[in-house]
A protein has these predicted regions:
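Beta-hairpin (beta-strand-turn-beta-strand) motif
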Residues: 86-87, 222
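Acidic, metal-ligating active-site segments
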Residues: 89-140
């Protein structure tokens, strides 16, 4: 139990520390703003340095002038927004059975069309040993692998929604009764339970097909899966391939996709300014700083974040310059390499990410920005579609209890003996202290 009286004694020290940090942040902000102005004057040379030299930190490449400020256009009256989010029940050896549950929230919101929305979730229980322990061959814990599989499921379901809502281009569309898995390389990546769920979802989603209107696919968080960098190549492929296949389907359906990051802590754009502050003629982190980039002389504004700087530069409804991320994992993304910009959505500065194919087509790019901004306005500071997808996906404490109660009933009906939780779990639930 938390002793608040003891915590209160530490509050004064915390408040004094935060006050000093706020003053220091203003100094860093002034330095960053000055470097931004200087870098704009030498932007072509700095971009060339970024492209030709190996740096010890991730610096995004600006593909527009650094002083770009663009007012985002109004969203069309008739449009559709789709979103997915996921949640799970973690596996535990202390429960009555070692299994886990993935729950993917699905949202389709139609505006100006007189159509009902889709708000539901698709649960899946993973219990077969070949699914539970497949990741152990790569030294990955089941609990960790479960999170990766949730990411895959979110992307696959988002692709299905985009195809069903907007239709697939290039003669690859499916009939109303057909399985959405065909021809996209997903079959080998899905468990048996996932196949049956996909077939059910195909029948449900067939009711959504109508004449197309501008449509946006939204996902919560980054499109850059940094965690993949540390995984063995076979595990990385098993996760990334179905995700990119789903993004291919969105591209063919001409449904732009964005990754929306609220309160982003990234400094990838600011790191480009470190090229300007580098005291050496040619940036070579290994040669001049022995690879120790955190304390390098070019790091003059840490720990300032991108959104802090752009909050001083953008007006509500404006976006900043477009950047191309330099994350190493993006070398595996092909035509889905990730770009991003910062958008003043009114309540905050959001980082909005796009696959390369969205940026390359102006209509898709403009649609993505205008519908994203509209979603934030409708959600009073956060995209309403993402908030609803989260609400559909979240597994609360009561849901967890009912899930295991249902599982216990089925195990007893199957004639299993000694069904129950471990003594440790039972003791934690029924404390008498």
């Amino acid at each position: 139990m938390l002793d608040l009286s003891k915590i209160a004694q530490q509050m004064q020290g915390i408040s004094q520390h935060l006050a000093k940090e706020a003053e220091a942040a203003q100094v860093r902000l002034a330095i960053a703003a000055q470097l931004l102005h200087q870098a704009r004057l030498q932007q072509p040379q700095l971009v060339e340095q970024l492209q030709t030299h190996q740096l010890g930190f991730a610096a995004a490449e600006p593909v527009e002038p650094l002083d770009t400020r663009v007012s985002i256009g109004a969203a069309p009256e008739a449009h559709t927004v789709i979103a997915t989010d996921g949640s799970q029940i973690n596996p535990s050896h202390h429960e009555i059975a070692y299994c886990y549950l993935l729950n993917i929230g699905r949202v389709v919101l139609h505006y100006g069309q007189g159509r009902f929305p889709l708000l539901d979730s698709q649960p899946e229980v993973i219990y077969r040993p070949e699914d539970l322990y497949a990741s152990r061959q790569w030294g990955i814990r089941t609990e960790e692998w479960m999170g990766y599989q949730r990411t895959v499921s979110e992307a696959v379901v988002l692709g299905e929604l985009g195809v069903e809502v907007n239709g697939e281009k290039g003669g690859r569309g499916k009939g109303k009764g057909e399985n959405l898995e065909g021809g996209h390389g997903l079959t080998g990546q899905l468990s048996k339970g996932q196949h049956s769920l996909r077939n059910k979802k195909s029948r449900q989603l067939s009711l959504l097909q109508r004449p197309t209107v501008p449509t946006l696919a939204m996902t919560d968080g980054s499109l850059i899966y940094w965690f993949l960098e540390q995984l063995p190549a076979p595990a990385r492929e098993q996760i990334l391939e179905p995700i990119l296949a789903s993004w291919d389907r969105l591209r063919e359906a001409q449904v732009p996709m964005v990754g929306y990051l609220s309160a982003s802590r990234s400094s990838e754009a600011l790191n480009f300014l470190r090229l300007q502050s580098c005291p050496h003629e040619q940036p070579d982190c290994q040669k001049h700083c022995e690879g120790q980039t955190d304390g390098a002389p070019c790091q003059v504004f840490s720990p300032l974040r991108d959104v802090t700087l752009w909050a001083t530069l953008l007006e509500p409804g404006q976006r900043g310059p477009l950047f191309k991320s330099s994350a190493d994992i993006l070398q595996l993304y092909g035509e889905h390499r990730v770009y991003f910009c910062h958008v003043h959505v009114g309540a905050e500065i959001a980082r909005v990410e796009f696959p390369e194919w969205v940026v390359q087509e102006q209509t898709l790019f403009d649609t993505a920005l205008s519908l994203t901004l509209m979603q934030v306005q409708k959600g009073f500071g956060y995209p309403v579609s993402l908030a609803e997808a989260h609400n559909q996906a979240v597994v609360r404490g009561g849901d967890r209890s009912r899930f295991f109660a249902l599982l216990e009933q089925q195990m007893i009906r199957a004639g299993l003996q000694n069904v129950g939780t471990s003594y440790k779990e039972a003791r934690k639930r029924d404390s008498i202290a």
